[in-house]
Swiss-Prot record:
PROSITE patterns: CYTC (PS51007)
Chain sites annotated for binding heme c: C10, C13, H14, M75
Any one GO molecular-function label of the UniProt entry: heme binding
UniProt keyword terms in alphabetical order: Electron transport, Heme, Iron, Metal-binding, Photosynthesis, Transport
Family, similarity comment: Belongs to the cytochrome c family.
PANTHER family: CYTOCHROME C (PTHR11961)
PTM annotation: Binds 1 heme c group covalently per subunit.
UniProt xrefs under SUPFAM superfamilies: Cytochrome c
Stated role: Cytochrome c2 is found mainly in purple, non-sulfur, photosynthetic bacteria where it functions as the electron donor to the oxidized bacteriochlorophyll in the photophosphorylation pathway. However, it may also have a role in the respiratory chain and is found in some non-photosynthetic bacteria.
Cleavable signal peptide: none
Protein name, as recorded: Cytochrome c2 iso-1
Organism from which the protein derives: Magnetospirillum fulvum
Length: 99
């Protein structure tokens, strides 16, 4: 699937290539796994302690407001969230296809 335009904001820090971390972890295969499992990426203590699974419910909240969803995480410090619900939905649907 082609990435939605809203994913351009994600690409500033995240790769979709397995094992290729940037400022943020690779998003390859992220959908459906527990937070904090991308190999060779140093997660914040907040992310590791969250115990969350990266699924539709989590991403709906997290992509709109990362700071409130996982207080103290790195992403929330620099990214305020996607403002349009349709952008959040488009990015979630795209992440479901990124293996």
């Amino acid at each position: 699937a082609d990435a939605p335009t809203a994913f351009n904001q994600c690409k500033a820090c995240h790769s979709i290539e397995a094992g290729k971390n940037g400022v943020g972890p690779s998003l390859s295969g992220a959908y459906g796994r527990k937070v904090g499992l991308a190999p060779n990426y140093k997660y914040s203590a907040a992310h590791l302690a969250s115990g969350m699974t990266i699924d539709e419910a989590m991403l709906t909240n997290y992509l709109a407001n990362p700071k409130a969803t996982i207080p103290g995480n790195k992403m929330g410090a620099s990214f305020g969230g996607l403002k349009k619900p349709e952008d959040v939905k488009a990015v979630i649907e795209y992440l479901k296809t990124v293996k």
